[in-house]
Amino acid sequence: QILLTQSPAIMSASPGQKVTMTCSASSSVSYMHWYQQKSGTSPKRWIYDTSKLASGVPARFSGSGSATSYSLTITSMQAEDAATYYCQQWSSNPLTFGAGTKLXLKR
């Protein structure tokens, strides 16, 4: 199975700061998908097919990458972006998730 390693595990950003988190796959995958989860809620699909934003996701979010290296970027951190972000692949069975990047707001 394909192992997804997310970095950093925990990070914080000030309002307006650019944020980048990465997801590294142990083998090449065709696409990467990202989910956002806030405490006490179910994960929401956030970015799919590497770079497509799910409905309602602000344009300050973007996704990029290929093969074994992928990233999620927020151009300008906002308070509501504080959450845990998970990458996921389903190019190869079984479907696998990364362990998550927890993003906190620095005030």
Swiss-Prot record:
Annotated stretches, region: Framework-4: 97-106
InterPro entries xref list: Ig-like_dom (IPR007110), Ig-like_dom_sf (IPR036179), Ig-like_fold (IPR013783), Ig_sub (IPR003599), Ig_V-set (IPR013106), IgV_Light_Chain (IPR050150)
One Pfam family from the record: V-set
Region (Framework-2): 34-48
Keyword Nucleotide-binding recorded: no
Region (Complementarity-determining-3): 88-96
Region (Complementarity-determining-1): 24-33
GO BP terms, alphabetized: adaptive immune response; immune response
Alphabetical list of PROSITE patterns matching this protein: IG_LIKE
Segments for region (Framework-1): 1-23
GO-annotated cellular components: immunoglobulin complex
Region (Framework-3): 56-87
SUPFAM superfamilies: Immunoglobulin
Domain of life where this protein originates: Eukaryota
Keywords carried by this UniProt record: Adaptive immunity, Disulfide bond, Hybridoma, Immunity, Immunoglobulin
Chain intervals for the UniProt region annotation (Complementarity-determining-2): 49-55
Disulfide bonds: 23-87
Function summary: Anti-2-phenyl oxazolone (PHOX) Antibody.
Record-given protein name: Ig kappa chain V-VI region NQ2-48.2.2
Organism: Mus musculus (Mouse)
Taxonomy of the source species: Eukaryota, Metazoa, Chordata, Craniata, Vertebrata
